């Protein structure tokens, strides 16, 4: 409750300051223009993230993953869940044992079984989700190495052994999906490529076998992507 009229005004002012871009969003662009605006935001996000990534962090991540007996990818919410699945798709093609999980109970069960020989990769656009932070702390208590793809300076980033940092990418145009998820996808693509190039001959053979298995199964032109 409010103590008096002054307190009421103060609380109303504080409430209006939270999510103000949703109370007074930017004007609607012309329909022919917002397509270009979305593309422009994606391009800007990719350039921003590429310039913010550190090659040494990817080298450290490759070193951890190369020694892992098992890799687990955790993510909650929309883009973060999808990106943890994307990690599984990318890494399994290279022969890495990996499983993705989004359910908070299953993540907790998994975290309790981890140790120094397993690696946990955690995807989060915010680095703030309480359930995700809890399971990462649990995994750390058993000395499991943590790779985080998340906002720099977030609580999740502070828990990571290796950080692949994301950067804020929100605009005042609230009606489109966040462009930040493209930064996470870029991090995953860079990591997967670094892993592939770490053992190029072995991975060439794995990819050849996948291509052969898919061509026998579905056919199609040689230029089709692997694994779709």
Model-derived features: positions:
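Hydrophobic/basic alpha-helical segments enriched in Actinobacteria
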Residues: 12, 31-34, 158-163, 214-217
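Internal, active-site/partner-interface "lid" segment
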Residues: 197-228
């Amino acid at each position: 409750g409010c103590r008096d009229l002054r307190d009421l005004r103060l609380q109303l002012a504080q409430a209006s300051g939270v999510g103000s871009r949703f109370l007074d969003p930017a004007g609607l662009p012309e329909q022919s223009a917002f397509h270009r605006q979305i593309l422009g935001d994606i391009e800007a996000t990719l350039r921003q993230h590429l310039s913010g990534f550190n090659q040494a962090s990817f080298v450290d991540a490759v070193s951890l993953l190369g020694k892992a007996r098992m890799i687990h990818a955790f993510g909650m919410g929309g883009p973060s869940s999808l990106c943890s699945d994307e990690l599984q798709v990318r890494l399994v093609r290279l022969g890495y044992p990996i499983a993705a999980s989004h359910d908070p109970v299953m993540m907790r069960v998994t975290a309790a079984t981890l140790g120094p020989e397993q690696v946990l990769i955690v995807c989060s656009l915010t680095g703030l989700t309480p359930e995700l932070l809890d399971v990462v702390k649990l995994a750390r208590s058993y000395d499991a190495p943590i790779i985080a793809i998340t906002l720099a300076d977030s609580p999740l980033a502070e828990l990571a052994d290796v950080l692949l940092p994301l950067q804020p990418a929100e605009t005042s145009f609230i009606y489109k999906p966040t462009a930040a998820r493209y930064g996470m996808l870029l991090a995953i693509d860079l990591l997967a490529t670094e892993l592939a190039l770490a053992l190029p001959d072995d991975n060439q053979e794995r990819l050849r076998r996948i291509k052969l298995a898919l061509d026998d199964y579905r056919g199609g032109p040689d230029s089709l992507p692997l694994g779709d």
